[in-house]
């Protein structure tokens, strides 16, 4: 692990700074400045993120506490609203369920008199009906108020569920003096309202729907319903039993109405006292609160025993008309002594009412306190959980910080090593750069030589291409010459053919002349035939249809031409002459056909050679001039082609000479370049040798200067010693 804050280890620079070293140091300083700026930016961003996280955590905690406090306030408002509704509904039910003063006075008078059984039974029936009506009205009002309470407290079921199932142990809160059940009816009547009330409260606690403002309506309803059930279960009872039951019901109604009227005042006083003392539980130390489960069991047991043990206890009190059996201590303030109901019934009812009020207030305060305590414990548990999570996250962040510090230190060591490597790389780079400069110089020289060689090769290629073009031109000219020679040969052949044709036509002309001569001879013979008795038909007679008078003797009628032909046929009979003429005619037709075939052959030959054939009539007239002109044209073209051929041959020879000359120049340039390279190498070697000699000469000069200075100092010292010796002498 590297030490933090060790900084960069710079190597000592022995030599002077060069421009490259200064540039590299400037780049390194800029990189360090950028790295420091990045580190500062990262630190600032990290601080901003931490502050943002803290702010978000604070917002979450404030939001959570505000939500809890809002829920508590809403629950308190709903409880106050439900209490107000319950109070108004119970006031209405109590106002409707009150009996007239005449009934009260009659019940009191009956308690001290000994009237007959008929009046007692009638009053008992009236009390039973009144209790039945009041219980019905009370049950209706309770059901309405209970529906209102359910609608107002339905949103808080989850919040108020399990209110009295906290960590506090309620098993320690017991009755100091439990209620004892006696054999008299009055004890059961006075103990039933409390039992039913507590049973209802226990059931509400178990259901999680406890509300301080609605805890008295079920007790009232239980009181009236228990009394009605007891009245129904005992149809035959004494007058004092009926008076006691009626007076107890009336006192309970008065206590209930007074409870609803004085509830707000007593609760306010109690909260003020508890606030002054600083604790809520300290005010209920002297009051015992029963365990809910045990109280529920006791109440059920007591209710069952009272319901099923009344017939046995009915006979025990039938003979005592004007006295009450003393109540067992339902409160710590009444004690355990026996007292008469006729002496102080209102005091016992007021004490019982105070006890109920106090217990209801205690239960209300206890419920609120336990609810607040439960919420505080939940919030405390959540805060502790958040604190643990924060501690864990802080530990993780601390570990991450230590790891990052370790990584930073290792990275600093790596950076130092990299800087050392960078310095080494810079030195190697300088050496390589110098070597690169030398290689670049050599490369530039070689590039110059290469350019020269490329230029020579380019010129050679140009000459070769030009030679190829000239060779192509020569080949084309040779082909043209060959073509001209072929055309000349073709023309010569054509001229020979025309000459032969001319000879053939000359023969035909001779034959024509001969035929003309023969025709004249035949005409003469015809004339001679007329002389021998042959009739010559004149030329104007058509088909010899002239009517001639028959002449004496057998004379054949022929035309003049036929007569000439017959004369030209020779002498002899007419048949022989005609046969001779027919043979001559066939020979002439065969000759004509032969001439036509020759003429067609000549025309086809002339069409193949792209030349026009002359008309036989034209050939007869001007064939010599055409042949002469064609010969002149052919001779002129031949001479022209010969001139071109000679000229192209001269060009070829000149180009070949140029190629040879250029090749010689390329060879000379190559040899000159090689010689120049050799000279350059020699000059470089000479330069290096001279530089070495210069360095050695400079070194020698420095040594000589040093020796000279040393000698001068010795000379001065010797002079000083000499002057000192002379001065001493």
UniProtKB/Swiss-Prot annotation:
What does the protein in this record do?
Answer: May function as activator of the canonical Wnt signaling pathway upstream of ctnnb1/beta-catenin. Might be required for dorsal axis formation.
Q: Where is this region: Disordered?
A: 80-156, 230-268, 289-344, 600-621
Family annotation (PANTHER family) = LEUCINE RICH REPEAT IN FLII INTERACTING PROTEIN, LEUCINE-RICH REPEAT FLIGHTLESS-INTERACTING PROTEIN 2
Pfam families per UniProt: LRRFIP
Q: Does the keyword Disulfide bond apply?
A: no
Where does this protein have coiled-coil stretches?
A: 27-69, 357-531, 574-722
Q: Which residues cross the membrane?
A: none
> Could you tell me what this protein is called?
Leucine-rich repeat flightless-interacting protein 2
Domain of life from the UniProt record: Eukaryota
Alphabetically sorted, this entry's keywords are: Coiled coil, Developmental protein, Wnt signaling pathway
- Record-linked Gene3D superfamilies: 1.20.5.4090
Alphabetized InterPro entries for the sequence? LRRFIP1/2 (IPR019139)
Q: Which taxonomic lineage does the organism of this UniProt entry have?
A: Eukaryota, Metazoa, Chordata, Craniata, Vertebrata
Q: Where is the composition biased (Basic and acidic residues)?
A: 115-126
Q: Which cysteines are joined by disulfide bonds?
A: none
Basic residues: which segments have biased composition?
Answer: 84-93
| Biased composition range(s): Polar residues | 99-110, 304-320, 607-616
Q: Name one GO molecular function term.
A: LRR domain binding
Q: Which gene encodes it?
A: lrrfip2
């Amino acid at each position: 692990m590297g030490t933090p804050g060790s900084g960069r280890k710079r190597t000592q620079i022995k030599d002077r700074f060069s421009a490259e070293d200064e540039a590299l140091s400037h780049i390194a300083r800029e990189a360090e400045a950028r790295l420091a700026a990045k580190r500062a930016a990262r630190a600032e961003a990290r601080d901003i993120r931490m502050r943002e996280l803290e702010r978000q955590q604070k917002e979450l905690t404030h939001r959570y506490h505000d939500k809890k406090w809002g829920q508590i306030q809403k629950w308190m408002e709903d409880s106050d609203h439900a209490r107000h509704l319950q109070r108004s509904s119970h006031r209405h039910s109590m106002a409707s369920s009150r009996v007239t003063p005449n009934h009260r006075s009659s019940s009191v008078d009956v308690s001290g008199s000994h009237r007959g059984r008929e009046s007692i039974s009638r009053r008992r029936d009236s009390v039973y009906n009144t209790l039945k009506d009041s219980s019905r009205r009370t049950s209706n009002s309770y059901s309405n108020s209970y529906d209102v309470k359910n609608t107002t407290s339905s949103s808080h079921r989850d919040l108020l569920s399990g209110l009295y199932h906290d960590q506090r142990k309620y098993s320690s809160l017991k009755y100091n003096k439990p209620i004892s059940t006696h054999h008299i009816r009055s004890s059961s009547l006075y103990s039933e309202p409390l039992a039913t009330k507590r049973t209802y409260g226990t059931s509400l606690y178990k259901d999680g729907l406890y509300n301080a403002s609605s805890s008295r309506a079920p007790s009232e309803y239980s009181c009236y319903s228990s009394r009605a059930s007891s009245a129904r279960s005992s149809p035959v009872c004494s007058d004092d039993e009926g008076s006691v039951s009626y007076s107890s019901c009336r006192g309970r109604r008065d206590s209930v109405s007074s409870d609803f009227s004085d509830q707000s005042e007593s609760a306010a006083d109690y909260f003020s006292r508890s606030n002054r003392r600083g604790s809520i539980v300290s005010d209920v130390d002297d009051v015992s609160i029963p365990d809910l489960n045990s109280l529920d069991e006791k109440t059920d047991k007591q209710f069952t025993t009272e319901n099923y043990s009344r017939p046995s206890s009915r006979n025990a009190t039938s003979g005592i008309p004007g006295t009450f059996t003393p109540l067992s201590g339902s409160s710590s303030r009444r004690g355990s002594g026996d007292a008469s109901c006729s002496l102080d019934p209102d005091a016992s009812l007021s004490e019982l009412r105070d006890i109920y009020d106090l217990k209801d207030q205690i239960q209300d305060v206890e419920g609120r306190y336990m609810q607040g305590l439960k919420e505080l414990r939940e919030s405390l548990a959540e805060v502790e959980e958040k604190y643990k999570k924060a501690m864990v996250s802080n530990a993780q962040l601390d570990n991450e910080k230590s790891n990052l510090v370790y990584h930073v230190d290792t990275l600093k060591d790596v950076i130092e090593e990299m800087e050392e490597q960078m310095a080494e790389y810079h030195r190697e780079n300088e050496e390589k750069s110098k070597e690169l400069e030398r290689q670049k110089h050599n490369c530039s020289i070689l590039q110059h030589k290469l350019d020269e060689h490329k230029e020579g090769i380019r010129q050679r290629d140009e000459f070769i291409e030009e030679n190829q073009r000239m060779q192509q031109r020569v080949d084309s000219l040779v082909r043209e010459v060959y073509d001209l020679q072929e055309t000349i040969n073709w023309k010569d052949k054509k001229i020979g053919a025309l000459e032969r044709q001319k000879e053939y036509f000359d023969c035909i002309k001779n034959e024509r002349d001969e035929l003309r001569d023969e025709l004249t001879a035949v005409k003469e013979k015809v004339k001679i035939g007329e002389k021998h008795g042959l009739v010559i038909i004149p030329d104007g007679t058509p088909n010899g249809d002239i009517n001639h008078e028959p002449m004496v003797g057998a004379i054949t009628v022929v035309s003049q031409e036929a007569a000439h032909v017959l004369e030209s046929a020779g002498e002899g009979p007419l048949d022989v002459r005609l046969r001779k003429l027919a043979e001559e005619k066939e020979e002439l037709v065969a000759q004509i056909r032969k001439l036509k075939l020759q003429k067609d052959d000549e025309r086809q030959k002339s069409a193949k050679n792209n030349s026009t054939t002359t008309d036989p009539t034209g050939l007869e007239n001007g064939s010599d001039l055409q042949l002469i002109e064609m010969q002149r044209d052919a001779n002129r073209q031949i001479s022209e082609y010969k001139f071109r051929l000679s000229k192209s041959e001269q060009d070829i020879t000149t180009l070949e000479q140029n190629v040879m000359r250029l090749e010689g120049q390329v060879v000379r340039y190559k040899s000159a370049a090689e010689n120049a390279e050799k000279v350059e190498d020699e000059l470089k070697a000479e330069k290096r040798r001279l530089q070495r000699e210069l360095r050695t000469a400079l070194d020698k000069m420095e040594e000589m200067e040093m020796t000279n200075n040393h000698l001068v100092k010795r000379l001065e010292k010797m002079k000083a010693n000499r002057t000192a010796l002379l001065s001493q002498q």
